[in-house]
Regions:
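Intrinsically disordered, low-complexity proline/glycine-rich segments
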Residues: 1-84
Length: 84
């Protein structure tokens, strides 16, 4: 699942701050893992806290919430990195 060449973010995917995606509340399964949406949580070891995903909202939506894609940001500014 991609938008403009960017792969969807799934539970367990990493961030450029060394963190990872903790939750993925959509019912969409991409290559065996749930896809993450706006508001799903990440953990940032640099900031030592959990932060919500804040996608740009230009891609597909699930029940009104935008999916997160490679390069989207978290509330602390970390970039999401897809494993797809």
């Amino acid at each position: 699942m991609k938008h403009e060449g960017r792969g969807v973010i799934r539970v367990g995917d990493k961030t450029d701050h060394g963190g990872k995606v903790l939750t993925a509340t959509s019912t969409t399964i991409a290559m065996g893992k749930a896809a993450a949406l706006k508001g799903d949580m990440t953990y940032c070891p640099q900031c030592k806290a959990a932060f919500a995903i804040q996608p740009d909202g230009k891609g597909a939506k699930h029940q009104g919430k935008p999916y997160a894609y490679d390069g989207d940001l978290t509330e602390c500014g970390a970039k999401l990195i897809t494993s797809l």
